[in-house]
Amino acid sequence: MEPLKHECGVAMIRLLKPLEYYKQKYGTYLYGLNKLYLLMEKQHNRGQEGAGVGCIKMHSPAGSEYVFRERALGSGAIQEIFSSINSQLANVHINEQSNEWVESYAPFIGEVYMGHLRYSTTGRSGLNYVHPFLRRNNWCSRSLMLCGNFNMTNVDEIFNSVVEKGQHPRIYSDTVIILEQLGYALDKENNRLYHEFTEKGLDGIPRALAIEDNIDLRPVLASTAPGWDGGYVICGTLGSGDMWALRDPHGIRPAFYYYDDEVVVVASERPVIQTVFNVPRRAVNELTPGSAIIVNKAGKVSVDDILGMGRNERCSFERIYFSRGSDADIYKERKALGRNLVGKILHELDYDLAHAVFSFIPNTAEVAFIGMAEGLEKHLDRYKADRIMACNAEGTLSRDMIEKIMSQKLRIEKVAIKDIKLRTFIAEGESRNDLAAHVYDVTYGIVENDVDTLVVIDDSIVRGTTLKQSIIKMLDRLHPRKIVIVSSSPQVRYPDYYGIDMSRMGEFCAFRAVVELLKEKGMENRLEEVYNRCLEQENVDDAHLENCVKAIYAPFTDDEISAKIASMLTPDDTSAEVSIVYQSLEGLHEAVPGCPGDWYFSGNYPTPGGIRLVNRAYINYYEGNVDKR
């Protein structure tokens, strides 16, 4: 129930018509900029630590800026950025200027736009880490601006490959290193064309324009991306107007695109494009894993296979939690996740629906709650039909009996309302925990004291901190006999290294529960055995890597681990019995068949880098290096 951080959200727009066209049709030169703002605001859920905007002016004369960038930190970054841009435009009185002047000189009024929303998964903060990143050059075709939703697992290898070429990256981060890698490949492509057109007799401006017109981004991407191990959507643009977005071969990170004769659009989520451009779902395409959508200077759009499509490992957590629930498929999948838990919930209730109250916390779990309620209603309908049939067979069926049977309803209530005004940052330690317990207001009078069971569904339980410090304490104030916490996702057992902020082994309540179970069962030596096996894996080649941490969980059933988690997360002064019900892996894959990536639940990582890092995470845990990721 504690919010997870996710890296990140991307948005790109390429205008395919002259700027004057948008002024005449839409009444403003800010058409592209306004659309970028909406794309970013609609994806604000994907990043609240910072944001950045980039713009390329393709017709800026020599001596004036052609690459614009604005970045800011904090949850209000989008507003800060666009306020700054609007101030700059107000200062030049854009509405009083000619088309030619706007096209040549107006800041942030260009043909290519890039937006980024940041959530850090590395612990690094500051404006230097906010996208887009920029590699400036006074040759337009060599200037490169980059942003992405990605996390690389083999940063050391990529860094070394860059340094071995003689380059000197200023910052040790995957974004900077990839920027330099792509910049090196872009320089090679420029040099190839430089020699080609020099041999054809071109020189000066004609040669520079010929290079811009003929840049081929496919070899630039194909010469660098095969060395990347991770989940990624890498977006880039050149100063000359070329633009691309490349998705990893396994489809771990999401990307969607739309284009017509006016615009090309790329974003992290489908419904965002649908809403902002008012287009039907069928018009928005998913970017094929391993492929790049490329737009050249002339505006020609192509989708090219760069890396080949690997095994489908689309991230299931995107569907459970991160992406907006307004996507048609995601909405259906989240409902299915709730329905698939009905059997376990009924078992916890001993099939007594009359004394059960159902609700959800937080709001992101509402769709799964609807599915759960539909599944329970279906069970209740079957029960009613069976009762009517039984009474009919016994000869006791009457109108009063039918009305009594049919009157049985699920008790669905809004149990908790978040108090958005309450802040806990001024307190520390126990006093902060006490304040955290009051972040939600409870609805009194809906639970029969010491009789009813309170069933509350959440989309995921990762660390369990908020559950222990706030939610269970808050629910216990309603005096239920029992509290059942339901997770629409399976137990989160393993770190993620592809863009979700959960990379420390000791953070997970499932892992902590298993460690306690091993100690209770006298099997503590297994912890050292796994540590030694992980050390051995440090020097194993990629083909023979294995996730040794799986052995930690092997001795116990899912139910045993769930019971231990419930025990650990229940505050000492809780009066009600507490149990936790998790989604099964089978239930997950049945509900979300198109996105089988489940490594944080199963330990089955999609790339060698993930396996290597999970073993390293266990080494750090065992050695007490709690701050290492």
Where are these regions (language model features)?
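Generic, well-ordered alpha-helical scaffold segments in large soluble proteins
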Residues: 161, 165, 181-185, 227, ...
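Hydrophobic alpha-helical segments characteristic of transmembrane helices
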Residues: 186-191, 342-343, 349-382, 399, ...
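Conserved short alpha-helical segments that host acidic/polar catalytic motifs at enzyme active sites
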Residues: 1-288, 294-357, 361-362
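Amphipathic alpha-helical
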Residues: 195-215, 376-396, 401-415, 421
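Extended, hydrophobic alpha-helical segments in both membrane/secreted and soluble proteins
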Residues: 358, 365-372, 376, 412, ...
